[in-house]
Amino acid sequence: MTEQQLDRVAAILDEHLATAQRTRASLLPAIVELGADVCDALARGGKLVTFGNGGSAADAQHIAGEFVNRFLIERPPLPAIALTTDTSVITSIGNDYHFSEIFSKQIRAVGQAGDIAWGMSTSGMSPNVVRAFEAAKKIGMTTIGFTGKDGGDIAKMVDYLLHVSSGSTPRIQ
C-alpha cells in the first residue's frame, strides 16, 4: 500500500469521525426525546413504518429488522415494517400511478394514528418520501425524518428531524 493510499483512507476516516462528532453534539437530545416517544407509541400498540430509496431503503429494512428481531438485548419482537421490501406492491404503484406514490399509498394502507413513520432521504427532497410524510401527517402518525445536506423539504414537515450536517452520502448514511 502506498503512502498516498494510506493518506486517502486516513482522510476518509477523519471525515467520518468529524461528522459523527458533530452529529452526536447536535442530535443527542432529539434522539433521547424521540426514543421515548417511539417507546410510548409501541407501548400503546403502535408500530414503526420505515421507508427510503437506495441505501436509505437498505437502512429502512435494517431498522425494521432490528425492531422485529432484537437489537443488543434479548426482548420480545416490536412491530415494525419496511415499505421497501414488497417488489410487487412497489412496482404496481410505480407503474399504475407514479414512483412518487410508492410509499404514500402503503402508508395509507397500513398506517394508523399513533404509529411512527420514519423516512430517510439523504437530500431531504425525495418526492416519494415527502409524499409519504404528507400521508402520515394526515393519518395522525408521528414522523421522523433522517436527512443530510440542508435537510430539504423534509426538515420542515417532520415531528423529529435527525439531520446529519454533511453533503456526503456515505457520511449521512
Residue ranges, per PLM feature:
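Short alpha-helices
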Residues: 147-173
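Short, well-ordered beta-strand core segments
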Residues: 117, 143, 161-163
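Generic N-terminal amphipathic, Lys/Arg-enriched alpha-helix
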Residues: 1-26
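A charged, well-structured terminal subsegment
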Residues: 109, 116-117, 172-173
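Glycine-rich, small/polar surface segments that engage phosphate groups of diverse ligands
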Residues: 37-111
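Surface-exposed amphipathic alpha-helices with a cationic face
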Residues: 133-137
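Short glycine/serine/threonine-rich phosphate/pyrophosphate-binding segments
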Residues: 56-61, 125-132, 154
